[in-house]
Each structure stands twice: as C-alpha cells, then as structure tokens.
C-alpha cells in the first residue's frame, strides 16, 4: 500500500509569495507598500505571482494605472481593475475578494492609512480566504495595501518602502536601481537593500546599512 507523502517544502513555498531575491511575503496576511515607487513594487510582486489579480484604486484620483507601462513587468491581461469612490469602499472590496479565496493577489490603494479595525478585518478575511482556497486546491490569498509617503497603517504584517536610487553604473544597461527598505515586520528586523531591475527581467538584491 502506498502512503501519501506530504511535501513540506512545497507547502512552505505556497505559504509565501516571492518579493525580491530571497525575500518573501507571508500569504493569508496583509502587507503594506509605501514610498514613491510603491506601484512598481506591487507590479514586481504581480510578475512573480500566478492567477488573477484584483487591483483596487481610488476612483477620484486623476492618475490611471497604465497597462502599457505594466506590460514589460507583468501581464496586464491578468488584472481586474476596480475603482472605489472612497477609501472605505476600497477596503470593503479588498475584504470581500480576500475572503472569497479565489484571487491569489489583492492590491488596494487608499489615500490615507486605515485604522486598526479595518486592518484586522482584512487579516481575518485573508485567513478565511486561505481556508477556502485550501479546500478547493487553490493558493492562499495575499493582500497588499499601497499607501502614500511613509505609510503607517497599524497592525500590518510588514511594511516596505521603495524609492528610486539613480546610479551611473546602470545607465549603460538601461536598468533601474531602487532602494528597498523593510520598515517593519513581525518576524524580521528593519533592513535596506539596493534592488536592481534589468530590462530583461533579471533582479539583483544588495544589502545596505540598516535604517535608523
């Protein structure tokens, strides 16, 4: 009689979403991206994920998410864009999609940092979605909250800041270099890296001095 063998390494991979290099985000939780390049960071995560992506944005913002600009990084055909008329509506939509367990990546942008209660609701929705996905053989959802400036939503699993870091050494290759900062995380200390993104999609992560 053959016995079922549990693949713990695969289970571990399914529990995390790659971010950059050996950095990863815990699924079934809500993480925060902030800084001037937060949309770029979300696009990089989207490129490493599989399945549909729901991206919720404030409907009153004049800026639009540019599918043509997204194309070199991630496939925009996977994207469902939702325009919310207020921050509360964006958070409600994110909560409902996370709870369904049918969408592996849910991205919500808001104009201001939510309070602790909405964040807790999003965590609970992501956990419920993970259970639903497990029953259906799917992937546990990951929630990303994009906030302007330094962010600051209470209770998030982790907070990441991305900003451009121009470098003459990359001008010849057409690559881009960013400063990626882990401002806080439940299971890791603050840290900082140079993240290099080349036109052909290759990435390089170089540690820097930790932020103060």
Model regions and ranges:
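Phosphate-binding/switch region of NTP-binding enzymes
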Residues: 144-206
């Amino acid at each position: 009689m053959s016995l079922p063998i549990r693949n713990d390494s695969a289970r571990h991979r399914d529990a995390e979403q790659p971010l950059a290099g050996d950095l990863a985000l815990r699924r079934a939780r809500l993480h925060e991206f902030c800084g001037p390049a937060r949309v770029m960071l979300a696009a990089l995560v989207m490129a490493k994920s599989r399945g549909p992506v729901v991206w919720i944005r404030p409907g009153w913002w004049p800026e639009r998410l540019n599918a043509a600009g997204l194309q070199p990084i991630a496939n925009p055909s996977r994207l469902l864009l939702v325009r919310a008329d207020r921050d509360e509506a964006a958070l409600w939509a994110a909560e409902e999609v996370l709870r369904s367990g049918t969408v592996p990546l849910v991205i919500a942008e808001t104009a201001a940092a939510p309070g602790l209660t909405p964040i807790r609701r999003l965590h609970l929705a992501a956990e419920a979605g993970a259970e639903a996905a497990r029953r259906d053989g799917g992937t546990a959802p990951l929630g990303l909250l994009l906030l302007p400036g330094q962010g600051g939503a209470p209770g998030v699993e982790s907070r990441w800041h991305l900003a451009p870091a121009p470098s003459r050494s990359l001008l010849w290759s057409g690559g881009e270099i960013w400063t990626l900062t882990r401002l806080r995380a439940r299971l890791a200390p603050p840290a900082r890296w140079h993240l290099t993104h080349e036109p052909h999609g290759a990435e390089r992560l170089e540690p820097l001095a930790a932020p103060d």
